[in-house]
Structures are given as C-alpha cells and as structure tokens.
C-alpha cells in the first residue's frame, strides 16, 4: 500500500522509536491498553486525586480530573490540596437517549453530580463535580441502562455526531443508525474498561487487544459527524471526518460526500496552530462507510505528528502532507472516491418548538441555555420522561428535542411543557437562541476566563445594542469559550469570543452563518466595555449598510471590516 505513495517526511510519526516522540506516546504504549494503575489509584483514600499518568489514561475512559477553581487559591493558602472532582462524559452516538436512560442519567446527576447535568456541543451528557469514590457508582449506573463512557475523551475517536432534523424523519433515523454503527466500530476494544469499572476478570487471549489502534492509539482526538443538508447543525466543517448525506430519488441515503480535516483548537500567540474547516474530497456509497472510515483514521494514525502534540490533529497532517497526498493515501487503502455531489446548507441553528414530520409524529425542541440542566429542570423533564413514549435527542447546539410524539399524546406533553414553564424559547432573543458557550470556570482546567457563567449576561447587553439598531430579529451566531481550544466551535461563528484572562477575551468576526467559513481576530485581549463598544460600531454599520438578506458575517467581509479567511493556516496572518 504505502509504497505506492509519493515519499513523505516520516520523522514525527508512528514509524519512529518512542524516545523520539512525545512522552504521551510512551505512556500509552506502556499502559497495558489503557489500564495503567487506574484501579489502584481509585482505592487511595488519602487524596481525592489520582496519579498524573492515570489522569491522562482516564481520559480514554471518558473521565477528566478537575478541581474547583473558584476555591483553588483559598485552599492553597490553607495548605490544602485542590478541591478535586471529576467530569464524566457519556458515549451517546447521535445524541439519542431513551426515556429510561434519561431517567437514570438524571438520577445519577442528582445523586453524584451536584444536582446538575451538562448537555454538550457533541450531543452527549457530562456529569460534573463527581468525587473520586463516586466514579464507579456513576459508571455502573450507566451500565445498567447499557451506556458507557468509552472513548468520550482521549486520543481516539470521540463521540460520533448526527443531524437532529425532524423534517426528514426517515433520513434522520437512517443516519442515526449509521452513526451508532460507526461509533461501535471505532471505539477502543481493550477490556481494561470492563475490568476497572465493572470489576471483570482479565482473560488471556491470543487475539490482538487493539487490532486497529495498536498500543499507541491515535496521535490526538479524532472527531466524526454525519449531517443531512440543508441544516448544518453538527458543524460538519469542524469535524476531522464528516459525512454529508446525499439523498437519492427514493428518499433514502444514496451516499455521502466526505469532508476531512476540520478542527477548532488553536493556541494564542503560537502561529503554527490554527482552526481549519474541513475539505470535501469525494463521494462514497453507504456500503463503503466502514472501510473508508478505517482508511481515513488509518492515515492519521500512521502519519499524524506524534512528536509535537500541538501539531498532532488531522488538520495539520493534511496541511503538512498536502490534501492531494492525503486523498491518495486514503484511496490507496479504500479505493477510488467518486466526485463529490452537489449540496447546500442554509443554517446551523436548531428549529425550536413543535415540528410535525411527514410521518405524522411531532417533535419539540427545547431551548436549554448553554446546555446546563439544574435540579429543577431535571425534575420537570423527568415528569415528561415518565409519560413520553418516544425518545429524546440532544442537539449539537446544546438543546433538547422531545422526539416522536404521537398526535394523540401531544396534548399531554404540551400540557407538561406549559405547566412547568419549559416552553419559553419564544421569550428569548434570536441572538440568545443562536448562542453557545463552553463550561469554562469553575471546573475546566484549561479555562482562562468565564464562558457559560458569563455569556448570558453579556448577551443581555448586546441585545440592547441590537434593539437600538432594530436588529433584534436578525439571526446572528455568537459563541464563547473560556480558552482557545474551541469546544463551542467559536471560530466559525459570526461573532466569536475566546478567553485570554479573567474578564478578557479575543473578539473574532466574519464567520459563516451556517458554519462554512472561519472568522478572524478583530480585537485582542479586551474586556466587556471594549467588546460592547466594538460590536456597537460594527452593528451600527450593519443596520444601515447591509444588503437584503445579507448575514452579519458576510457583511463584515464585504464591508471591509474584516478580511476573509480562505484557509485556516492563513487565519493568523
């Protein structure tokens, strides 16, 4: 295979000895397929933390060690260790959640997660504030409803996303099933997870424990998603591997356009890191889905940078090797790709409220600001779950869909929504409905500034500006993160804010309305007053100078307010 490809630099990839690569590669190789000393660390009651190497390995199990950063300095003054706790992320392909699973997850969140639950931008749940001795009860509780946390984090294939669009129920169901098939295929196969968390015995076997990943897994995380045009709700161009469904004349999926190399993360003041939108390289029929997925991931596994983790994502492999070389490498493994087929996107937002699909079912999308569910909201949704005969869908915009409600059952669900006050989306501005924020403070160890806790307040102030210029009904996407890693995909928002320090943010403008274009830095390291001043000026021009139906991001480029980003590698210019 590889000997048919043009020569390429392999000085940083899996072909090199471990001593020439990042220390993380040796850690993975020596971990006994992600077992490490995790089981022993959980037994240590002297500390509420786990050993450093196990912190990294536990990510492959869907678990992050964190601490309460609001009290970190005070605990340091008192000579106490940080208030360690853990975030646990569920594997939930396509964001599909049965009512039984919802009730169990809600129960676990209230018992072990500080009575709060977070829906994420990748259509799954996160438990926060879980103490070390409660990790096993949470994971075993999930196992009771056949859920797990395998590969929700770590250098592997993360949770697989799929469009949530009730207007195409048959296509949506087909796509969700394919997302689960791919997810089940690409997760690590090590039995270490079962041994550590379920207490199973290790069984000797002559079969390879990780036939695809090997001992060192992927160079970095690898994200896969499926989308049905015209709604780009999953932000397909932010995926390492994106499948754009193309419908046939029979109403079924005829195949997929393949988009590769998307990714949001960057590091401030490090110009060789940058976000990138995925490149469409061809089309395949559904029967080739698994083989092509393996081929794309295999190319990144074998040629991705394992020496410098800041350059280890697939987007950098593509830009270093060249898109044509990468496509050749994929075709070398999986066969030739057909030319990409036409498609178009119109939005990446959710459709709120009730929608009736052509199969006669009804679906209600509930706005959940920044995906945060407190005890009161969990209890209200639990009452719906007890009577709902369909299922729930978590959306990529951190909202919740009550799916597949029969006409006869709609009045009952509607009464519960109205009676509980959950129907409130029409009370929010269009800007708020099109906003997202990551968790950031106080739990995320990477955060430099607030995000989830601050964005609602900032939006209220921006709403005043929009009203002043009669723009309150204009759909504008706004996303905020507490650091430049980009978990809420801020670099493709029309307005993006990324944290630099407490109360300070970088302001980005010019992203595409449906996630098709990166934005560019407009103001650096500024506080609230400067953010509002900058937005006031730009929105004032937008109000008077925009063309009919011109989106805000498009206007900022046409008006010369910001230069268009044509490729991610030029976004720092």
Curated annotation (Swiss-Prot):
One of its GO terms (cellular component) is sulfite reductase complex (NADPH). Signal peptide: none annotated. Binds 1 siroheme per subunit. Binds 1 [4Fe-4S] cluster per subunit. Keywords: 4Fe-4S, Amino-acid biosynthesis, Cysteine biosynthesis, Heme, Iron, Iron-sulfur, Metal-binding, NADP, Oxidoreductase. Its cofactor is siroheme; [4Fe-4S] cluster. It catalyses: hydrogen sulfide + 3 NADP(+) + 3 H2O = sulfite + 3 NADPH + 4 H(+). Belongs to the nitrite and sulfite reductase 4Fe-4S domain family. SUPFAM superfamilies: Nitrite and sulphite reductase 4Fe-4S domain-like, Nitrite/Sulfite reductase N-terminal domain-like. Its EC number is 1.8.1.2. This is Sulfite reductase [NADPH] hemoprotein beta-component. Component of the sulfite reductase complex that catalyzes the 6-electron reduction of sulfite to sulfide. This is one of several activities required for the biosynthesis of L-cysteine from sulfate. The lineage of its organism: Bacteria, Pseudomonadati, Pseudomonadota, Betaproteobacteria, Nitrosomonadales. GO terms for molecular function: 4 iron, 4 sulfur cluster binding; heme binding; metal ion binding; NADP binding; sulfite reductase (ferredoxin) activity; sulfite reductase (NADPH) activity. It comes from the Bacteria. Siroheme binds at residue 487. HAMAP family: CysI. Alpha(8)-beta(8). The alpha component is a flavoprotein, the beta component is a hemoprotein. [4Fe-4S] cluster binds at residues 438, 444, 483, 487.
């Amino acid at each position: 295979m590889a000997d048919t490809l043009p020569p390429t630099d392999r000085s940083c990839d899996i072909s090199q000895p471990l001593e020439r690569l990042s220390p993380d590669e040796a850690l993975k190789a020596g971990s006994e397929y992600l077992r490490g000393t995790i089981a022993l660390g959980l037994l240590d009651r002297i500390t509420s933390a786990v050993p450093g190497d196990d912190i990294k390995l536990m990510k492959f199990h869907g678990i992050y060690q964190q601490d309460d950063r609001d009290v970190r300095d005070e605990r340091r003054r008192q000579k106490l260790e940080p208030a360690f706790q853990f975030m646990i992320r569920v594997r939930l392909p396509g964001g599909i959640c049965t009512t039984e699973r919802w009730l169990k997850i809600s129960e676990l969140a209230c018992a072990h997660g500080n009575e709060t639950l977070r829906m994420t931008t990748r259509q799954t749940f996160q438990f926060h504030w879980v103490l070390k001795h409660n990790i096993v009860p949470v994971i075993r509780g999930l196992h009771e409803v056949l859920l797990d946390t395998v590969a929700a984090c770590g250098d592997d294939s993360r949770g697989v996303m799929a469009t949530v669009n009730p207007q195409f129920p048959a296509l949506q169901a087909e796509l969700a099933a394919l997302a689960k098939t791919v997810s089940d295929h690409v997760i690590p196969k090590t039995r270490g997870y079962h041994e550590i968390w379920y207490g199973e015995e290790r069984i000797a076997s002559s079969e390879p424990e990780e036939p695809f990943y090997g001992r060192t897994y992927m160079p970095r995380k690898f994200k896969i998603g499926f989308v049905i045009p015209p709604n780009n709700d999953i932000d397909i161009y932010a995926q390492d591997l994106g499948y754009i469904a193309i419908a046939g004349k029979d109403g079924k999926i005829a195949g997929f356009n393949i988009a590769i190399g998307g990714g949001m993360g960057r590091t401030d003041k490090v110009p060789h890191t940058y976000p990138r939108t995925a490149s469409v390289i061809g089309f395949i029929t559904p029967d080739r889905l698994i083989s092509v997925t393996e081929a794309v991931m295999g190319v990144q596994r074998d040629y991705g940078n394992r020496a410098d983790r800041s350059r280890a994502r697939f987007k950098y492999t593509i830009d270093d090797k060249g898109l044509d070389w990468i496509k050749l490498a994929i075709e070398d493994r999986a066969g030739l790709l057909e030319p990409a087929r036409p498609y178009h996107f119109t939005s990446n937002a959710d459709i709120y409220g009730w929608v009736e699909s052509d199969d006669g079912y009804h679906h209600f999308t509930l706005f959940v600001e920044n995906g945060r569910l407190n005890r009161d909201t969990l209890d209200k949704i639990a009452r719906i779950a007890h009577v709902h005969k369909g299922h729930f869908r978590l959306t990529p915009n951190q909202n919740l869909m009550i799916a597949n409600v029969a006409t006869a059952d709609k009045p009952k669900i509607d009464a519960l929504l109205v009676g509980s006050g959950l129907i409130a989306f029409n009370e929010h501005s269009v800007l708020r409905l099109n906003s997202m924020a990551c968790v950031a403070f106080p739990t995320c160890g990477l955060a430099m500034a607030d995000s989830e806790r601050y964005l609602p307040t900032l939006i209220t102030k921006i709403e005043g500006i929009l009203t002043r210029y009669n723009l309150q009904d204009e759909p504008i996407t706004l996303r905020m993160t507490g650091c430049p890693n980009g978990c809420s995909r801020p670099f493709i928002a029309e307005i993006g804010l990324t944290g630099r320090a407490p109360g300070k943010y970088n302001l980005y403008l010019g992203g595409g309305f449906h996630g098709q274009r990166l934005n560019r830095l407009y103001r650096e390291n500024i506080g609230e007053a400067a953010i509002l001043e900058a937005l006031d000026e730009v929105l004032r021009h937008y109000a008077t100078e925009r063309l009919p139906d011109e989106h805000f991001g498009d206007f900022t480029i046409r008006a010369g307010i910001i230069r268009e980003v044509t490729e991610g590698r030029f976004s720092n210019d």
